């Protein structure tokens, strides 16, 4: 009787391990994404016509027309960039 219980428990553990491996391989091989990524709701980054520079006070010059300054590392010249698209970042101000 004791032999049958041990065999049953070993078989149960073996089935559980196979089940977990099967679940992992099915989810790891799936090609579908969890969120839709259509081009209708994507964000497009565009460079503006102006550059931005750092002044003697250590402050970057402002970009015009809804653009913001992008610079790399310790460079003193950057490019103005604008984001267009369907994005909804929360405002720090409370809604009225």
From Swiss-Prot:
Compartment annotation: Secreted
Chain segments annotated as transmembrane: none
Positions annotated with a glycan in the UniProt record: 51, 74
Keyword Secreted: yes
Keywords: Disulfide bond, Glycoprotein, Secreted, Signal
Signal sequence range: 1-28
Gene Ontology cellular component list: extracellular region
Disulfide bonding pattern of the chain: 48-67, 52-69, 63-80
Source species, domain of life: Eukaryota
GO molecular function: C-X-C chemokine binding
Known function: Salivary chemokine-binding protein which binds to host chemokines CXCL1, CXCL2, CXCL3, CXCL5, CXCL6, CXCL10, CXCL11 and CXCL13.
Name of the protein in question: Evasin P1100
